[in-house]
Amino acid sequence: MEYKKRVDALVFFSLLLLGYFAAHAHGNGHVTDDVNVSAPAEEGILREKRAQCAQGFLPCKDNKCYCCIGGRTHDCYYTMAQCSHACF
């Protein structure tokens, strides 16, 4: 009787683990970049850790001196406010 409970538990946890990996693999196939929409978690990470607006070297190309680094875009802008709005 004890052996049957262990086998049942092993089968249950194996199926649970298989379901987890199947759901995880299915979630990795879902890409939101095709429509230029970032996931909220990704946006929060970019805002806190990597994204920043930096002033480029003078003279700036087309007077766009503030460049987004590591954010949603990698473009340069006329003002820091424009850069921050586009980058974060």
From Swiss-Prot:
Subcellular localization: Secreted, Cell wall; Cell membrane; Secreted, Extracellular space, Extracellular matrix
UniProtKB keywords: Cell membrane, Cell wall, Developmental protein, Disulfide bond, Extracellular matrix, Glycoprotein, Membrane, Secreted, Signal
Residues bearing glycans: 36
Annotated tissue distribution: Expressed exclusively in endosperm. Found in basal endosperm transfer cells.
One GO cellular component term noted in the UniProt record for this chain: extracellular region
Disulfide bonds: 65-87, 68-76
Segment forming the signal sequence: 1-27
Domain of life (superkingdom): Eukaryota
PTM section of the record: Glycosylated.
Main location: secreted
A UniProt-annotated Pfam family: Meg
InterPro entries linked: Meg
Family: Belongs to the MEG family.
Function: Regulates maternal nutrient uptake, sucrose partitioning, and seed biomass yield. Necessary and sufficient for the establishment and differentiation of the endosperm nutrient transfer cells located at the mother:seed interface. Exclusive expression of the maternal allele at the early stages of endosperm development. The maternal allele is hypomethylated. At later stages, expression becomes biallelic. Regulated by the transcription factor MRP1.
Entry protein name: Protein MATERNALLY EXPRESSED GENE 1
Organism from which the protein derives: Zea mays
Gene that encodes it: MEG1
